Each structure stands twice: as C-alpha cells, then as structure tokens.
Amino acid sequence: MNFLLQLIIDGAFAATASLGFGMVFNVPKHTLKYCAMGGAIVYSLRTIFLHFNFGIEISTFLASAVIGIIALYWSRKYKIPRPVYTVASIIPILPGTYAFGAMTTLIDINRFGASIELIESFTHNGLKAIAVLIAITFGLVLPSLY
C-alpha cells in the first residue's frame, strides 16, 4: 500500500512538471491535460519497472515506448503532431541527477586534479545519462516506425 501511495504522489508531481513544461512550450490549451497525463504515465511506469529490478535504461526505454504508442494514438485521434504530447511528457524522466553528478565531478576534477575515483564517477554518471537519453530516444521513435 505504501508503494502505491508513493506512486500516486510521484505521478501527481510528474503530471505537474509536464503540465508546466507544456505551458512553457506553448502547446494548445486542450492538449495540456494529455501532456500532464503522459508525464504521470511515463514516470509511474518507469518507477514500476524500477521496482521490479529492471535497470534504469530498460525502464526508461519501456516507459518511453509506452508513451510513444499513446502519443501516436492521441496525435491521430486529435490531429495534433505527436511531439506536442511527447516532449512535455518525457520531462519527468530526463536523467538530470546523472548529468548533474557528471558535471559536478568534472568541476571537482578541474579544481582538485584528476584522481581515479573522480574519473570513475564522471565516466559512470556521464555514460548513465547518455544511456538514459538514448533509451528515451529509441522508446519514442520505435512506435512511430510501425
């Protein structure tokens, strides 16, 4: 029960973030609810996959593929381009923590000099961020190919 409650709360915050970015990207008003719904869906799905011990990359890919399929349906139904839904929806799953960790480690390398631990941390965080971005890209692109 605790996991379900936390999932609902996190989904609501993800929907709020997607809604905000939808407003920033100036999407049509009638699509804002779908952007928010997409953000909640994609974040909740990724959290569920992570809970079942999928890796972050696979979880992100699967969640992105699902929102890609849903956005493809919405775009055909409402005659709105697919990126209107997908761009705002994927905002909650962007790898900000890993990118931030890579950049702060890079600053530490510049400030204190290179050490094995810092280089390892930079490489790990940077490659993890790139892998998650690639997973998002393929997850969004593959549904539109069929």
Protein language model features and the residues they cover:
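Juxtamembrane helix-break-helix junctions at the cytosolic face
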Residues: S75-K77
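Juxtamembrane non-transmembrane "cap" segments at the membrane-aqueous interface
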Residues: A88-R111
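Short glycine- and Lys/Arg-enriched binding-loop motifs that mark or flank ligand-binding interfaces
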Residues: C35, Y85, P92
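Alpha-helical transmembrane segments and their membrane-interface boundaries
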Residues: M1-I69, I80-R82, T105-Y146
